Structure formats: C-alpha cells, structure tokens
Amino acid sequence: MKRSLWALVAVAVGIGWAVSPAAGAAPAQNQPGGSPNSDIGVTADTIRIAVIADVDNPVQPGLFQGTVNGVQAFAKYINGHGKLAGRNVQVDFIDSHLSADEARNAVIRACQEDFAMVGTNALFFNNVQPMEQCVDQVGQMTGLPDVPTLQTETPHQCSQISFAIIAAAIDCATVNDHPQTYSARVGQILYYKKQNKDLHGIWVLPSDLKSTINSTTPVATGDTKAGVKQDQDFFKISGLATQSDYTPVAATIKQHNSTYAQSISDYKSSLNLRKESKIQGVSSVKVWDCALQCYDAKFLSQGGADVDGQYASLFFIPFEEAKQNKSVDAFLTAIGGKGKADGFAAQAWTAGLFFRDVVNNVVKADGNNGLTRARFIEEARKIHDFTAAVGGQGMLGPTDVGAHKLNGCFVLTQVKGGKYVRVFPKEKGTLNCDSKNVTTIKLDQT
C-alpha cells in the first residue's frame, strides 16, 4: 500500500471569489442579529477549523503533512490579511493515522469542537455518518461542513455536505447503476495527439487497494477513449513493487514499440518505470505521461537524467510562476517558500480559500454573527466558478465546487534539464479550460 497512496492524488487531478465581488478576507461588519458564538467552533474572536489527515503512521510517516502545512499556511495568510468574519482562524490538526477508526474518532471530535473540516485527507474515511449526523449548537442535525483535499471512498465523494475542490470522477447519481458514469480529464491527451499522430501504449495502475484500482481505472479508460490505443491490458502492480517488477512492463513497451506510457501511481512508480525501461533499451516512447504526483522535487532529485522529458499535467498554476499569479505567490510566502510546498499543500491552500469565500458570502448576507454551519452549507452549494483567487488572480480555472463537477482546466509541464518547464498553454500564468478537456465514460466497478 505504501507507494500506491500517491495514486489517489494522481486520479483526483487528471487541483476567487465566486459570488461576492471581493477576493480577500471580508471586512468586519456590524449587522444586527445573531450571536458572536453563532455555532460550534465560533467565538467572538476565533473560528476553529479541523484538518484531519493521515500523518503519523508506520506505513509512510509524514504522509499528508503537506495537507496540514497548506491549511496552516491559509490560516496564517488570513490572520495577517484582515481576518475572516472579524475573527482569527484557528487550525486544529487531528491525525487519522491511516485508520478508519481514527478517522471516525477525528470527525466526532471535530463535530464537538470545530466549525468545519478543511483539507480533509484521510484515506480510510469510509464512514460519513458522524459527519452527516453531526448536530449544531442548537441541536439540529445540520452536519459538519467539509472542504476536503482528497476523497477516496464513494460515500465521502457523494456526501452533500462535502465540497471537494477536486471533484470525484464518479457521477454520484449513477452510483447504483450498472454501469456507473465517470468523468475523465483528457486535455493533455488531446495535446499529445496533436503532436504525435499515432499514440499507443501501456498504463500501470496500483493494485494494493480496491479504491486505488477503482479510482485509476476511469483515468486510463478516459485516455483510451480520447484516442491512445492499448497495447496491453492495464498493468496492476503493487505500490511496494521494486524496479525489477517493472521488467514485464518495459518488455511489453519494447515488444510493441509503444509510443505512450503512464503510471497512475505515486512518483516512485514512474521512476521505476523510467529506469527499468532505460535498462531494457526502450527508445520508442514519445510521451512519458504523468500528473501531479510527478510534480515533486523528489522526483527530479531521485530521477536525474532518467526522467528527462517526463510530462506532468497540473490543474493549478505552477509554483515556478509565482510572479505571474498572486494566489501562488501568497501560498508560497505563507508556507515558507517553494522548498516547503508540494501538491498536497497546494490543494489544501485552495480548500482554505474556498472556505474563506463561503464564509465571506455568509457574512455579506447575514453579518459577522450570522455564521452557522447550516448557512455555510447553503452558501457553499451556490459557488459554481471558484478559482482560488488572491488579489483577483485565480490559482485554478473556474470550478463548479457547489455542484461537485470535475474541472478540465490544466497546464502541461515537462522535465527539461532537471526543471519543470511549461509546455502548454504557452503563456505563463494561464490554464487551458477547453470544454473538450473532460469526457464521460461508463464502467461497472461494483
């Protein structure tokens, strides 16, 4: 399981003020009505939010520390830029320890102490009952608002009080259908096809968990629908596999003179694939594909020259372009520099900004003392073009978070000389958001 964990992030990717006109913290308001202690986790001077994440665990210590760092960076930014609803944001980190029981206990604790969950990143969050049946300050079963970084289980993905910036691939209305309907990002595939007429190849999926297989299969299937032909059935390889376990994959690439190859697992899987392919003398591949998991300093340092040419498609403006984007710049400043930033932290930052926008919308309508969980959930459902903006510049393309719709916006980078270089679209600080970047597929994964 250890190395397959990044696969869940690879799937989720292919990572603004949405309703009110401002893009920062809301100014203090003194509208009548309500109480300074308007709901659980809200006092006259503080809004408490919980970040539940798998960090301390024996499998991969520090796994989602980036998520915690990202939420804390958000709070640091907000508290230094006008606060939120006239209050400071306090982050309560609750470790879920890669455990379903710990995740459940963490949600129960957050229900009792915090206004909402932000940046949730617990792989075994498979019981949403404590979240959905959480009672508010007046005893109503409102539910505990959730703005997660990652959702791996269908009940969490389809919860009506959970608002993921990266929407789940599954169409929740089809969960009980046979087959189910999924959305897949294919913008990068459309770009590759314009550059290479005949793409055919292989995909590696992580085999350790049913959830990783179910999450990655729609991604690979979407690629084939977009026009990359399969040379072999999808390879399913354990996240604990070593480089030698990729010998059959490299042999298949060589046998078919494959022009396309992608591992939809963690960055180490892509490293093993590239290194073993080099040993086997593979020379036919035109597109070594990858997503957010390969946008990592460790991928560059451990891969060296062996990963030159690797593509990494992102759904946010790259860190290298902080000068072109105020949200990226604010994120990197708050977290302590590019060296401390990673994909998990960036996603958590955008989750925090969504929380900010929803709170600001509540405050605009009801005043600082009108902030309740029920109103938060109501306003969250109305946001359909979230961009994670700071100073009017969004880190994301317009995203329909309120309706749980997948965003097809992307930027394609490529490793060149040990650095990530923007490939498409050419202009820095931009994303490609063509409607053709998302396709639908049908799979029965029950």
Regions found by a protein language model. Name each.
Residues 335-345, 356-423:
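Segments of small-molecule ligand-sensing domains
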